[in-house]
């Protein structure tokens, strides 16, 4: 007998009294009666027969196992804690560890291990469940066909959930061969030692139906595997088979919608989701899946890809509401706080998707410009997915965005003199203009509490980035730019998870080692390099904001040493290194970093999936133009990046009292951009230079007009102390635009 797993409705159930050798006729009769009573749903009669068997053979642990499973089904599969406890006791009686499974005895004990793997699956202990399942797979030859298929389907499901699509597809090929042969391993022993367990069934009609159901399930698993691998051509072939075998059922329509989503056909994906009949779904109490929750989540992911972030947030909130309603109904049935897995069907242990939805919602809020709300979502998700370096980076980005100036100040500069002039004091001859400080103080959540407390502060951002770096594997090569914080959902029939929608296409190297990053998709080698570059850039920025110049210089140097660095991050690396060096009074080294010739490219390095996705489309199909575009980031061109370099280079020359060089850099930069695009810091630099030159009136005119004016050639022998004050650095978080405010 086996605890039936909802994803594998064909899992076999057996009753037995012991080994087939030495079994009396009375034991065989009781065993057969118990099995027939179990399959017909008469669990009371089944338990009575098992009790009689127990009286005859008190030392056979398999009778205890079957009794526990019968009790479990009698209670509508709601006593998971009791079944789990019994299985653990029996496992300790048979073997102390799974690693000891290496002999023929383990074939006889296979049903015990299978039941244990099923429970581990429902408790989301996927690694442990895979370890047990793979041990069972080693002894699959003697198993009878139905049980062998159940083991394979369980392993396939686990491989899909852990993003091991290649292993899943290999196992599906084995399953297809097993089903096509038809005979299976009929001459093997049944899992519980009763060879007469199938006597009461009528083979042909039932067998044909089971084979068709298994084939349909295989096609669905193949689609899910190909979707994970982004192998859209192979997926397209399997989608046709799914629609032929499963029709317009909700799982098949969800899978096809996911396929169209990956191809960029977002409107078609939405149309397919809307055409699914959710009302026909059996419900989460029977399957463990809340289809409404999955529906809203998938709509949110599609609208995220279409850059309709506010709509995406709306749909994710609807999904969270559905999920909370499901959890409230499930928690109402549990009256014993000591047994947290009991009081509800075992399949519903997989129903709660709160943390996956919070992850998606947090990423969406971060893109829409609500970092504090995003932080609240992600800080809750990280308590469960604490081993995901990408999630720690997102938390750091929330902290950075929450502690920087407004987007208007950063992207447009200060449009009027009101932004430059803080106040005017005195009257008449004593009238003075007080210029505003351009430093941005970190005042959010800065109340003296420990930086380890999860609040959206720059100090906590430093901790998040440190965690992210520690979670990255050491050996990495071929970095590319980090490809964003996209989220999507696995729209398969059995589970959903958040995924990065900018993951590698099917043309990525098969040899890449995958690094798990739940709930998003695992990280391939090039994605790890992209991620490391983004983490280093953020780390340098945060270190500068905290005044840790040595650490900032270290991170910036590491960033610039990456073998394949995107142009935009290389630009930031030079700026951050220069600022740290200036703070360390190493002006000459800083000037080397501020050379405009260092900037030859400002691309993000994002390789869009659209080319790969479009290659399998028919001649009459067109790719949608919306969604998955690279965001407009600052600087938008090499020219504007070099302008920033020149402004900052002029500031560095000021620190060495080389005012002529500073003035030359300033006017060269101003000539490269529109006058309205000149940042206020550049105007303040020009004011300072004119004051140094003795042109007080021209400096006042610049302040009044808030623009650069032609310099008057007058020289002053008086050299005043420089009043250089660095501006809060720009930061590399992916927002609608980078700030034009640069350090000088």
Curated annotation (Swiss-Prot):
Entry's localization field: Cytoplasm; Nucleus
Bias type Low complexity, positions: 496-506
Cellular component terms per the entry's GO annotation: CCR4-NOT complex; cytoplasm; nucleus
Domain of life the protein comes from: Eukaryota
UniProt keyword annotations, A-Z: Acetylation, Cytoplasm, Nucleus, RNA-mediated gene silencing, Transcription, Transcription regulation, Translation regulation
SUPFAM superfamilies: TPR-like
InterPro entries: CNOT10 (IPR039740), TPR-like_helical_dom_sf (IPR011990), TPR_rpt (IPR019734)
Listed Basic and acidic residues bias regions: 1-16
Protein's GO biological process: mRNA catabolic process; negative regulation of translation; regulatory ncRNA-mediated gene silencing
Residue ranges of the region described as Disordered: 1-26, 183-204, 475-522, 602-632
Polar residues bias spans: 183-200, 602-612
Residues found modified as N-acetylalanine: 2
Subunit structure: Component of the CCR4-NOT complex; distinct complexes seem to exist that differ in the participation of probably mutually exclusive catalytic subunits. CNOT10 and CNOT11 form a subcomplex docked to the CNOT1 scaffold.
Family in the record: Belongs to the CNOT10 family.
Function (record text): Component of the CCR4-NOT complex which is one of the major cellular mRNA deadenylases and is linked to various cellular processes including bulk mRNA degradation, miRNA-mediated repression, translational repression during translational initiation and general transcription regulation. Additional complex functions may be a consequence of its influence on mRNA expression. Is not required for association of CNOT7 to the CCR4-NOT complex.
UniProt name for this protein: CCR4-NOT transcription complex subunit 10
């Amino acid at each position: 007998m086996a605890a039936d797993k909802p994803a594998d409705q064909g899992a076999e159930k057996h009753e037995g009294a012991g080994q087939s050798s030495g079994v009396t006729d009375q034991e065989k009769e009781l065993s057969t009666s118990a099995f027939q009573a179990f399959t017909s749903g008469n669990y009371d009669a089944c338990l009575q027969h098992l009790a009689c068997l127990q009286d005859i053979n008190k030392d056979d642990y398999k009778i205890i196992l079957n009794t526990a499973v019968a009790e479990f089904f009698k209670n509508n599969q709601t006593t998971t804690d009791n079944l789990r406890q019994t299985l653990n006791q029996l496992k300790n009686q048979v073997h102390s560890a799974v690693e000891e499974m290496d002999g023929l005895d383990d074939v006889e004990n296979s049903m015990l291990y299978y039941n244990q793997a099923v429970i581990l699956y429902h408790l989301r202990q996927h690694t442990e469940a895979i370890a047990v399942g793979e041990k069972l797979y080693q002894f699959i030859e003697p198993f009878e066909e139905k049980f062998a298929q159940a083991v394979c389907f369980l392993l396939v499901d686990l491989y899909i959930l852990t993003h091991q699509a290649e292993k899943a597809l290999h196992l599906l090929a084995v399953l297809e061969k097993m089903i096509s042969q038809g005979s299976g391993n009929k001459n093997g022993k049944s899992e519980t030692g009763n060879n007469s367990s199938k006597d009461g069934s009528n083979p042909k009609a039932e067998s044909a139906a089971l084979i068709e159901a298994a084939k349909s399930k295989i096609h669905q698993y193949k689609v899910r595997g190909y979707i994970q691998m982004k192998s859209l051509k192979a997926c397209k072939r399997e989608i046709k088979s799914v629609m032929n075998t499963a029709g317009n059922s909700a799982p098949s329509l969800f899978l096809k919608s996911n396929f169209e989503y990956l191809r960029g056909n977002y409107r078609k994906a939405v149309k397919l989701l809307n055409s699914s009949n959710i009302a026909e779904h059996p419900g989460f109490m029977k399957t463990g899946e809340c289809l409404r929750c999955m529906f809203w989540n998938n709509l949110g992911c599609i609208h995220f890809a279409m850059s309709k972030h506010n709509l995406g947030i709306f749909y994710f909130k609807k999904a969270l509401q559905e999920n909370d309603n499901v959890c409230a109904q499930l928690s109402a049935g549990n009256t014993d706080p000591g047994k947290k897995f009991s009081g509800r069907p075992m399949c519903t242990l997989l129903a709660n998707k709160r943390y996956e939805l919070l992850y998606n919602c947090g990423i969406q809020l971060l893109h829409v410009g609500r970092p504090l709300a995003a932080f609240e979502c992600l800080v809750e998700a990280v308590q469960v997915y604490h081993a995901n370096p990408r999630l720690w980076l997102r938390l750091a980005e929330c902290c950075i965005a929450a502690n920087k100036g407004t987007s208007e100040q950063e992207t447009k500069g200060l449009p009027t003199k009101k932004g430059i002039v803080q106040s005017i004091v005195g009257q008449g001859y004593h009238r003075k203009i007080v210029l505003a400080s351009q430093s941005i103080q970190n005042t959010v959540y800065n109340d003296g509490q420990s930086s380890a407390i999860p609040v959206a502060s720059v100090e906590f951002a430093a901790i998040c980035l440190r965690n992210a770096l520690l979670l990255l594997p050491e050996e990495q090569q071929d970095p590319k730019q980090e490809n964003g914080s996209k989220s999507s959902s696995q729209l398969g029939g059995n589970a959903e998870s958040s995924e990065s929608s900018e993951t590698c296409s099917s043309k990525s190297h098969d040899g890449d080692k995958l690094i798990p990053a739940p709930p998003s998709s695992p990280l391939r080698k090039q994605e790890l390099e992209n991620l490391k570059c983004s983490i280093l850039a953020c780390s340098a920025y945060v270190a500068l904001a905290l005044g840790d110049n040595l650490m900032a210089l270290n991170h910036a140097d590491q960033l610039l040493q990456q073998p394949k660095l995107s142009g935009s991050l290389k630009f930031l690396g030079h700026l951050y290194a220069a600022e740290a060096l200036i703070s360390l009074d190493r002006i000459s080294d800083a000037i080397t970093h501020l050379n405009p010739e260092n900037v030859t490219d400002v691309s993000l390095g994002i390789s869009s999936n659209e080319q790969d996705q479009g290659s399998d489309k028919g001649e009459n199909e067109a790719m949608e133009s919306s969604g998955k575009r690279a965001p407009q980031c600052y600087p938008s061109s090499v020219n504007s990046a070099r302008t920033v370099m020149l402004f900052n280079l002029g500031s560095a020359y000021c620190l060495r009292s080389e005012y002529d060089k500073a003035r030359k850099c300033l006017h060269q930069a101003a000539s490269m951009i529109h006058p309205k695009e000149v940042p206020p810091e550049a105007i303040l630099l020009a004011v300072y230079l004119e004051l140094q030159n003795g042109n007080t009136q021209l400096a006042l005119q610049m302040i009044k007009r808030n623009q650069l004016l032609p310099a008057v050639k007058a020289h002053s022998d008086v050299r005043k102390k420089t009043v250089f004050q660095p501006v809060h650095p720009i930061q590399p978080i992916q927002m609608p635009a980078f700030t034009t405010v640069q350090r000088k």
